[in-house]
Every structure is written in C-alpha cells, then in structure tokens.
Amino acid sequence: MPKYYCDYCDTYLTHDSPSVRKTHCTGRKHRDNVKFYYQKWMEEQAQHLIDATTAAFKAGKITNNPFAGGPGGAPPKPAGVSIPPPNMGAPPRPGMPGMPYMPPLMNPMMGMRPPPIMNPMAMMGPPPPLGTIPGVRPGIMNGPK
C-alpha cells in the first residue's frame, strides 16, 4: 500500500486515504508548517528583490533614486508643473492637514449596501396647497375666527 508523503511536514502518513490526508491537513502542526514554509519563501523573494536592485544600482542601471527627496525632504517637481489647490467642495483627502479630528471614510462591508442618500427636496414634505403661503399653517392665514 503506498504511503502519502507531506512535503511541508517532511513525514509519511500511515496510508494514502482521503480521510487520513484530510485529518493531517487540518492539524495544527501541518498548518504551522505550511505557514512557516510560505513565510520563509516570501522572505527569500524579498531578499532576492533587494539583491537584484542593489546589483542593478551598482552596475549603473539605476541612475537616480525616485524616492530620494529634494531640498527639505520633498521630492523634486518637474519643471512647469504645479500642484492644483485642494477642492473646497470635496471632502479632504487622507493625510491633508486642517481637519485632524475627522475619521477616515469607511467602505461598507462586502454584501452590504450603503445607506440611501436622501434628496433635500424629499425631506421638505409635500408642497403646500395652492393659494396658501409656504411655511404658514392653513388655519392661521386669516386669523382666529
């Protein structure tokens, strides 16, 4: 009977059946080993990217650093380009100074619809009857009788 070998755990299971594999794969040790394997793989990929970037920089393939700041720590602006003023009618962008007490806008949870936006005209109620003054109750127009 063939045995099942788990690469993550570096072990053989007693026999190759779906129930044994399922029990093994749901176990704490197996899940920890899988998590450790992918963490190690991500660290290796990050180190490879760092090494490749460093080698390219030393070889002169990267001439300037796009992340290096200009005077005062701000990145240099291209000639003739100016930053437009903030839109006063729109909500502030995240990180904009001036309103530090405002919480960030939250996205609705998946599957939930956002609350309906009421039309200001719909909140006023029905229009007054013809021949009446808006804002005055109909029984008060001519005074008490």
From Swiss-Prot:
The segment annotated Disordered runs over 67-91
Comp. bias (Pro residues): 73-91
What Pfam family is a match, any one?
zf-U1
Which first-to-last residue range defines the signal peptide?
A: none
Q: Which UniProt keywords apply?
A: Metal-binding, Nucleus, Ribonucleoprotein, RNA-binding, Zinc, Zinc-finger
Keyword set includes Cell membrane: no
Location relative to the cell: Nucleus
GO molecular-function term, one example from the UniProt record: mRNA binding
Zinc finger regions (Matrin-type), where? Answer: 4-36
Give the residue spans that cross the bilayer: none
The free-text function statement in the UniProt record for this protein reads: Component of the spliceosomal U1 snRNP, which is essential for recognition of the pre-mRNA 5' splice-site and the subsequent assembly of the spliceosome. U1-C is directly involved in initial 5' splice-site recognition for both constitutive and regulated alternative splicing. The interaction with the 5' splice-site seems to precede base-pairing between the pre-mRNA and the U1 snRNA. Stimulates commitment or early (E) complex formation by stabilizing the base pairing of the 5' end of the U1 snRNA and the 5' splice-site region. Regulates alternative splicing of a distinct group of target genes.
Q: What is this protein called?
A: U1 small nuclear ribonucleoprotein C
Species of provenance: Drosophila melanogaster (Fruit fly)
Underlying gene:
snRNP-U1-C
